[in-house]
Amino acid sequence: MCGIVGYIGDSEKKSVLLEGLKELEYRGYDSAGLAVLSNDRLEVFKTQGKLENLKLELKNKEFLDFGVSIAHTRWATHGKPSSANAHPHFTENLALVHNGIIENYASLKKELENKGHAFLSQTDTEVIAHLLEETLKSESDLLKAFEKSISLLKGSYAILMLHKRAKESLFYAKSSSPLVVGKGKEGVFFASSLSVLAPKVDQFVILEENSVGRISLENFKDLNNIENMKDYAFEDKDYSKGNFRNYLEKEIYEQHSSLLECLEGRLEALSVYCEIDPEFLKNVSEITLCSCGSSYHASLASVYLFERLAKIRARAILASEYRYAHFKSNPNELFIAISQSGETADTLEALKLAKAQGLKTISLCNAPFSMMSRISDHTLLIRAGVERSVASTKAFSSQVMLLWLLSVYLGKQLGTISKEEERIQAKNMLNSVNAMKVEPKLHEKIKRLSKRYLHGHGFFYIGRDVFYPLALEGALKLKEISYLHAEGYASAEMKHGPIALVDSNLFTIALLSKHLLFDKTKSNIEELSARDSTICVLSSEILEIADDFIQLEESESYMEEFFRMNLAVQLLALEIAMRLNHDVDHPRNLAKSVTVE
């Protein structure tokens, strides 16, 4: 969601902070700002919109002397996007940035207003600044006052604060929101993500949950759990768009490579392997998959695979619902939490609840140092690489692939899948990887037909069995980047209400599998065609009633079909959004990493 950067040192602070914010830009934001304390002078700069606006504001500024500094990209939760609501928030003597949500800010704000504090913004974060100023009236020690103020907050937060009385230090607080600190030759650096620090630091610390402290160049060495950056491999990847029009297009094209990376060391000689000790999976009789957004659609798809291949009961639950639904747990239940970032707030809290209930836990994520990977029993990395675009493509595909592999591996350990079936599934996985190569003819056809789908009152994406979750994902992709209304449905559900919306101005994207329920799905498509919906069919089998037909190559299995259709719906969403002139990498109102509830 939001991004935090902090720096203590004598390098030029504007460039350090802006470079860090640029690395966090893909997470999504609507405003940005920074504060620098140097030579006894506190300066704050804030702008609405893109980082370019902040750069223009700072065009003639340089901060060359030693000092402390903080910066932030904001995604609005309390208060509209504006310069006033942007971070840092400040008083005469301090400035701070904050990721998270302060749940009791309204009552704290009322108390502070009664004591004479005047607020300039609509945010929950500004309350923290005034709360600290108020606390300092009775507690002169800065760290103690900071700790006392933090203890009054309810909610989630990662906070960095600088104060005129502490010219060589930054104060931090962390609870349910990521924050990392590291030290290198040029000083001490803070960030929301370790990847931002990797090129700059030799040592780093993932700050502990519910920790509060003060850090300077001198006392960094006193932190607990210091790790050496050289012990970890951070690939120096080319993050430029290259010849692609945007990062989303690039990442769609990268999926063949990212899926190969996902399977590296996990599929050899048509046998599947996994980093999880078979003993850990012994006696597992039920699986709960917990996630949000695209990860939830990957979870739904895997339910069919776990039940069909491993012969084990599985269910997919939205993380935001799991936390409050009081589900009865099973002692032999395996809880799988799925999140690209490994920091998704609802999924993280659901994982903590599962741990508290004594369940066996596995995290699937794309970040080796994420909070989810640190608290679960085991972590399986999807190895999708960095996704700059907010809309998930590589991560979704890799999640489905890894869950598919896990279903076969689990069946192998439980004795519910034969060696021959394992070989068949392994071959199908390799075929599915190859299916994710973008054929120029396919892309050109989708680009041409996309112009038909720019107007109307909405889209139905329909599919059955494992293609139902893919219909949900296809509809989500279109919604995210085109801002057109789209809904995914199980095909047979049309007659139970949604068909009332069908007319000549409604588009249907039909996922017609040759291998699963072909005749049933065809019948559902005919029902929609009879009511004048414009039908676009994705299939290897020609359907005469289709108004548009995206013919896919023949597939040997339904999962190979799944990945071929996945690629096609991603390209269709991309091309429709491009025709509508939208910023597909940074859709409005969306954040890449949702670290608040």
Swiss-Prot record:
Q: Which residues form the Glutamine amidotransferase type-2 domain?
A: 2-218
- Subcellular locations according to the entry: Cytoplasm
Q: Where is the SIS domain?
A: 276-416, 449-587
Reaction catalyzed: D-fructose 6-phosphate + L-glutamine = D-glucosamine 6-phosphate + L-glutamate
The UniProt keyword set, sorted, is:
Aminotransferase, Cytoplasm, Glutamine amidotransferase, Repeat, Transferase
EC number(s) from the headed UniProt entry = 2.6.1.16
Report if keyword Thylakoid is assigned. no
What Pfam families does this protein map onto? GATase_6, SIS
Q: Does the keyword Transmembrane apply?
A: no
Gene Ontology biological process terms, A to Z: carbohydrate metabolic process; fructose 6-phosphate metabolic process; protein N-linked glycosylation; UDP-N-acetylglucosamine metabolic process
Which superkingdom is the protein from? Bacteria
User: Which SUPFAM superfamilies does the annotation name?
Assistant: N-terminal nucleophile aminohydrolases (Ntn hydrolases), SIS domain
Enzyme class of the recorded protein, top EC level: transferase
Q: Name one GO cellular component term.
A: cytosol
GO MF annotations in UniProt = carbohydrate derivative binding; glutamine-fructose-6-phosphate transaminase (isomerizing) activity
> Which PANTHER family does this entry report, sorted A to Z?
GLUCOSAMINE--FRUCTOSE-6-PHOSPHATE AMINOTRANSFERASE, ISOMERIZING, GLUTAMINE--FRUCTOSE-6-PHOSPHATE TRANSAMINASE (ISOMERIZING)
Briefly state the protein's biological role: Catalyzes the first step in hexosamine metabolism, converting fructose-6P into glucosamine-6P using glutamine as a nitrogen source.
This protein's assembly is summarised as: Homodimer.
This chain belongs to the protein called: Glutamine--fructose-6-phosphate aminotransferase [isomerizing]
